[in-house]
Curated annotation (Swiss-Prot):
Residues 18-379 form the FMN hydroxy acid dehydrogenase domain. This is Oxidase FUB9. Pathway: Mycotoxin biosynthesis. Residues 1-20 are annotated as: Disordered. A 2-oxocarboxylate binds at residues 44, 187, 277. Fusaric acid is phytotoxic to plants such as cotton and banana. It has been shown to induce programmed cell death in plants. In addition to a mild toxicity to animals, fusaric acid exhibits acanthamoebicidal, antioomycete, and antimycobacterial activities. PANTHER family: 2-HYDROXYACID OXIDASE 2 (PTHR10578:SF149), S -2-HYDROXY-ACID OXIDASE-RELATED (PTHR10578). InterPro entries: Aldolase_TIM, Alpha-hydoxy_acid_DH_FMN, FMN-dep_DH, FMN_HAD, FMN_hydac_DH_AS.
Length: 387
């Protein structure tokens, strides 16, 4: 099925006002986007597993890390650029994989990609996307924006092989293996809402035999059984035998697993608790980064997602040792608010906030950002070093 024939699911459910609200922050954007979505899809994107404790903790944890700016530094020329997957990126910010962008807006993943490509922001495409991986990467007409394809440990390995081959041919730079979801988390809002997707919703990157049934998320989701017997040694070796794309693993939350990932020779890890959507009451990812960075820094690339809402949050992650930060819901909120233009608005907010934070903290380039720019406010209200 071609992209133009894919069903369109309007996100807006009310025409109470034709004027757009003023958006000055990601929190403004979240509210405006949520107002446009139906309850079912708003709860699907905004909610987490069980009691949403991890979801809330991911965001709240940033408030304990306080900025310690250096002054009288030359910040007349701020360079935010870095590299990812062997390609230059505008700043250490990318878009995480999230499924079914067309539930938020008809622009879908192509709309998200268009906004990313215009700003040289890397994007990880979910296997459960509504647009073809070729159309998504095609938004970077000159190939200067790096893309990665996300895969899960599917029991049917031909699904993974097909995705890897297509991604390689389409110029993708990496594959991101999700390792924290051998089964779906218990998401109470989705159960209460009877979550399903519109009839005829398509997943063009998956083989025809997976296109019917329920994959554990709800009605209309492809029947994708996960390999619950997958192990580090066997799975990583098999993935490497199937592709020469960079191999990253997403969903690492233990220093012990970070060490195993290094031993298995992965190119990078993404510290992630799935945005609080899998196992509730896990620690905030920014706190986990503080544990993992001393183990992994200099041995593999370190990225992180979960709870990022401000440019200063990105700064804090870099100061703690992250090479890169990914955001998922923020792109969805932008998409729901105003399609591809809304994604651009979301990214611009973070870009401008990050640049401002660098300047006010006395940093003119990424390598200037160090742990000395942070203090941790402990439970006694006393500032202490982060390392």
């Amino acid at each position: 099925m071609s992209r133009t024939n894919l069903p369109i699911q309007p996100a807006k459910m009310s025409d109470a006002t034709s004027s757009k609200p003023q958006i000055f922050s990601i929190q403004d954007l979240k509210q405006a986007a949520s107002d446009k979505m139906s309850q079912m899809y708003r709860d699907y994107y905004n909610g987490g597993a069980m009691d949403n404790i991890t979801l809330a903790t991911n965001e709240a944890a940033f408030d304990r890390y306080l900025l310690r700016p250096r002054v009288l530094r030359n910040v007349s020329n701020i360079d935010m650029t870095t590299t990812l997957w062997g390609t230059k990126a505008a700043l250490p910010l990318g878009v995480s994989p999230s499924a079914m962008h067309r539930l938020a807006h008809a622009d879908g993943e192509v709309g998200t990609s268009k906004a990313c490509a215009a700003r040289h922001i890397p994007m990880i495409l979910s296997a459960l996307s509504n647009d073809t991986l070729e159309d998504v990467s095609g938004q970077s007409s000159d190939g200067s924006t790096p893309y990665a394809i996300q895969v899960s440990p599917f029991k049917n390995r031909q699904i993974t092989t097909n995705l890897l081959n297509r991604a390689k041919a389409a110029g993708y730079k990496a594959v991101v293996l999700t390792v924290d979801a051998p089964m779906f988390g218990r998401r109470l809002d989705d159960l209460r809402n009877g979550f399903s997707v519109p009839p005829g919703f398509s997943f063009p990157n998956l083989s025809a035999q997976t296109q019917s049934g329920s994959g554990g998320l709800g009605g209309g989701i492809p029947d994708l059984s996960f390999d619950t017997g997958a192990t580090w040694e066997e799975k990583i070796a098999w993935m490497k035998s199937q592709t020469d794309l960079q191999l990253w693993v997403k969903g690492v939350t233990s220093p012990l697993d970070a060490q195993i990932a290094i031993e298995q020779g992965v190119d990078g890890i993404i510290i992630s608790n799935h945005g609080g959507r899998q196992l509730d009451t896990t620690p905030a990812t920014i706190d986990i980064l503080r544990e993992i960075a001393p183990v992994a820094k200099g041995k593999t690339r370190i990225a992180i997602d979960g709870g990022f809402r401000r440019g200063s949050d990105i700064f804090k992650a870099v100061a703690l040792g992250a090479d890169f930060v990914f955001v998922g819901r923020i792109a969805i909120w932008g998409l729901a608010y105003d399609g591809s233009n809304g994604v651009g608005l979301a990214l611009d907010l973070l870009i401008n906030e990050f640049k401002l934070c660098m300047g006010l903290a006395g940093c003119s380039k990424i390598s200037d950002i160090t742990p000395a720019h942070l203090s941790l406010l402990n439970a006694k209200g006393v500032l202490e070093g982060v390392y």
